[in-house]
Amino acid sequence: MNKLYTTLLIACLAAGFTACNDDDCEDLHLGNLAHYPIVLKGTFPTESQVLELGETLEITPELLNPEEATYSWLVNGKEYSTEPTFSYKIDNPCRANLTCIIKNKYGKVEMSTSFSSNHDFSKGFFYIADGTFNFYDTEKKVTYPDCYASLNAGKTLGMGNYDSANIIHSNGKFYILIKTSTSNRDHFYVVDAKTLYYENSAVVGANLSGLTILNEQYGLVTGDGIRRIDLKSLNNVTVKDEYMFCFYNSMVYNGKVLTNDTYQKESKVKYYDANELISCLLYTSPSPRDCS
C-alpha cells in the first residue's frame, strides 16, 4: 500500500514539474504574484464621480508594491496622462469614461470608472458653430465650447467646411439636419434637448434643409426630395423625389400641413392632409389642396 502511495506521489510531482515547464508558469508562480501591481482598497473610486464646473478631479491609486510601476490614464479611450496621479479640471460640461492601467514587469491591473460635471443648461442657449454644439450661459455670461463632444465621448457631428446645420426642437429632442453633398455619412441626428446626450443618427439624404414634425413619431424631411421619417427608428421612405421648398417652413395645424408651394413672399397657402402623408407609400405623395 505504501509503495502504491509513493508511486502516485512521484507521478503527481512529475506532473507538477512538467506543468511548470510551460511559459505561463512563471506568471503563476506565487513569488511573482506577490509582485503584481496591487491597488489598495479605497484608493480608486468605483462609483462615478460628479464635480462642479471649475473643480479638479484627482485620483491617486496607492499600490502595495509601487516599485517600477508605470501608469496610463485613458479618457474615453485616449491616453490623457502617464503620471501616478490623475488630475483633470472640469472646465466644460462633460461626461467621460476613465480607465487606469498600471503595469510592472510582472503584470498589469486595469481599472475603470467614470466622471461627469454638475451643470445647468436651463439658463442659456445652445448654438452650433464650427461644426459642434456650444452653450452660452446667460447668467454667468460664459461660453462653453464643444459641449456636444465633451458630453458624448468625443463624438462630433462630422460637419465639413462647406456644410451647414439646421436644428428643430420638438418632443424634448433636438433634431439636427446636416446640409452636405456627401451621401455616405450621417445627415440626421437626434439629441436629448436637456442633456445634449446623443441618442441616434442615420444616413437620410444629401442637402437636408428642413423638417416638419407631423406627430411624436413621424416627420417630413426636405432635401433632394421629400422623405417621411420615423423619428424613433429613423427609418425613412421617399414620398416625393423632386426638390421642393414647400415643406421647408411649413407648419401643422388641425391635422393639416400648411405650405407655400411657390416659396414666394406672396402666394396662396395650400395644405396637405397630415394623415395622408403619414400613411402614403413610396413615391405616392398626395396632392396639395387649396385652403378655403
PLM region spans:
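Surface-exposed, flexible coil segments in extracellular/virion-facing regions
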Residues: 74-88
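An edge-strand/N-cap motif at the start of beta-rich repeat modules
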Residues: 116-140
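A short beta-strand motif characteristic of beta-propeller blades
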Residues: 144-158, 197-203, 235-241, 277-282
